[in-house]
Amino acid sequence: MGARLVRGRRPVDAGVGLTPQPWWFGPQELAPPGDEAPFDLVLLDRDGTINVRIPDGYVTAPEELLLLPGAADGVARLTRAGCRTVLVTNQRGVARGLLSREGLVAVHRQLDALLAPAGGRLDAVVVCPHEQGACRCRKPLDGLFREALSRAPWARAERCVMVGDMPSDLEPAAGLGMRTEQVSAARDLAEVARLLVPSVRGSVVQRGEGHVP
């Protein structure tokens, strides 16, 4: 069966050229944060944590990406605290031919544009583009988290935190010794960020290169 059409767009070739490895968008090696940062890494889920999840579907174009309430303020608070932030996301729509690598980059450029006015920034993005069972990185497996740690050799798992909305986001991080925090309709990312960073001093800390190619 070929890739199916989504909202009138032509499908890309499903899974063509995929290897079992995750996709990393960012510096080859992340620079460590300053001494003031409360965590080595803050790992953030995407759909349902930062942006509105599309029921039974995928964000396949920039205009479909809608921020959840509190998301921009939450990421901005983490940025001001000097945290290194890494987006950790399953995107099976790639394997199903619903968007290409370039299409995913365009979606994440839009995410950057939506976060920037509040002062938020992501330092890197790590993606599982695979179908279930085709890799070791699709959450709830821990490959995405291991990839993030490998790109930050100075980071210790016990000084990292994962924020997500689903048990599949949190369980692999906890298994590696990371702290976990769950967002929900009653507890948005801004509230979780205030818990993680009770006070923020000064202005935005100078950041790394960012993740956009």
Label each residue range with its predicted role.
Residues G2-D40, R101-D123, Q132-M162, M166-P213:
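Asp-based, Mg2+/Mn2+-dependent phosphohydrolase catalytic module
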Residues V6-R84:
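Active-site neighborhood of HAD-like aspartate-dependent phosphohydrolases
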Residues L44-R46, T89, V163-D165:
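Active-site flanking residues adjacent to catalytic metal/cofactor-binding acidic residues
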Residues T49, V94, L98, D165:
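Gly/Ser/Thr-rich helix-start
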Residues N51-R53, R96, E171:
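Conserved protein kinase catalytic core
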Residues P55, N90-Q91, A185:
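Active-site loop/turn elements of alpha/beta-hydrolase fold enzymes
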Residues A71, V75-H108, R121-G133:
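Substrate-recognition element of Asp-dependent hydrolases with the DxDx(T/V) motif
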